[in-house]
């Protein structure tokens, strides 16, 4: 039976570029230096990454901190008092958040192959390396990943960023303040703080939290401003009050 197609319909290249993402966008983490930090381009999204908060992390880790900050240090002993923990750059924190957003899609949706496999590889690349380019060798993946699929991936990443924005700052009232995602080789924990998002990467068994024999952990801080441009609404009054209540948090 003959079927109708839109094979020769004219499209607006500019409009398609604005809405769509190509595979190379997912496989390139392009970084350029700015006065305050870096500009990062990934999946058709431009992020402004700043150094803000990193000096505080270093001081908390090296015991060079004001007494009023001890609450923050004691809240995360597996990071600040662990000889096996290391501080990474904010660029690393962004990579981990993006990898977590991809993993979140893999967990929540029944994605077909080769899309699921391709996303898993891209997530591992972001999570375990600091290289700017990932070479996707599989031609089958390139052929089957449509513009619509790639745009959906970007859309889901932006939804994940909004989920992070909806978290409450760490507090004593039991409100949700962290997102935790486990992969085969890692545990990712992203926690909302006054200054932004404290990002940590641990072993799958979270051995870093073992007080007697703490395992390895990597962590960093991504400032609030980096993700704020992609969130849908301003903080609610409740969030603002909690931010104020927790102003004694060093970060």
From Swiss-Prot:
Keywords tagged on the record: Host cell membrane, Host membrane, Host-virus interaction, Inhibition of host innate immune response by virus, Interferon antiviral system evasion, Membrane, Viral immunoevasion, Virion
Q: Which GO terms describe its biological process?
A: symbiont-mediated suppression of host innate immune response; viral process
Name of protein: Membrane-associated protein VP24
Q: Which InterPro entries match?
A: Filo_VP24
Annotated organism of origin: Zaire ebolavirus (strain Kikwit-95) (ZEBOV)
Q: Which family does it belong to?
A: Belongs to the filoviridae membrane-associated protein VP24 family.
What gene name does this entry carry? Answer: VP24
Record's Pfam families?
Filo_VP24
This protein's record includes keyword Lipid metabolism: no
Q: What does this protein do?
A: Prevents the establishment of cellular antiviral state by blocking the interferon-alpha/beta (IFN-alpha/beta) and IFN-gamma signaling pathways. Blocks the IFN-induced nuclear accumulation of host phosphorylated STAT1 by interacting with the STAT1-binding region of host importins. Alternatively also interacts directly with host STAT1 and may additionally inhibit its non-phosphorylated form. Plays a role in assembly of viral nucleocapsid and virion budding. May act as a minor matrix protein that plays a role in assembly of viral nucleocapsid and virion budding.
Q: Could you tell me the membrane topology recorded for this protein?
A: Peripheral membrane protein
Q: Establish whether keyword Membrane is in the entry.
A: yes
The Swiss-Prot or TrEMBL record annotates one GO molecular function as: structural molecule activity
Cellular component annotations (GO), alphabetically ordered? host cell endomembrane system; host cell plasma membrane; membrane; virion membrane
């Amino acid at each position: 039976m003959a079927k109708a197609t839109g094979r020769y319909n004219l499209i607006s290249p500019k409009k398609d570029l604005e809405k769509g993402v190509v595979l190379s966008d997912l496989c390139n983490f392009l970084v350029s230096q700015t006065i305050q930090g870096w500009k990062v381009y990934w999946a058709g999204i431009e992020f402004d990454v700043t150094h803000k908060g990193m000096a505080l992390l270093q001081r908390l880790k090296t015991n060079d901190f004001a007494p009023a900050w001890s609450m923050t240090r004691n809240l995360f002993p597996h990071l600040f008092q662990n000889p096996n923990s290391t501080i990474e750059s904010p660029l690393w924190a962004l990579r981990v958040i993006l990898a977590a957003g991809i993993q979140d899609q893999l967990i929540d949706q029944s994605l077909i192959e080769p899309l699921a496999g391709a996303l898993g590889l891209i997530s591992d690349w972001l999570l375990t390396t600091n290289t700017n380019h990932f070479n996707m060798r599989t031609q089958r993946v390139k052929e089957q990943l449509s513009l619509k699929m790639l745009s959906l991936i970007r859309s889901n990443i932006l939804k994940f960023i909004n989920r992070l924005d909806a978290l409450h700052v760490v507090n004593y009232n039991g409100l949700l303040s962290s997102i935790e995602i486990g992969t085969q080789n890692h545990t990712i924990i992203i926690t909302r703080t006054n200054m932004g998002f404290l990002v940590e990467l641990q072993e799958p068994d979270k051995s870093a939290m073992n007080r007697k024999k703490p395992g390895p952990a990597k962590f960093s801080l991504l400032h609030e401003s980096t993700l704020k441009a992609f969130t849908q609404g301003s903080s609610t009054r409740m969030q603002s009050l909690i931010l104020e209540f927790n102003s004694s948090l060093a970060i």
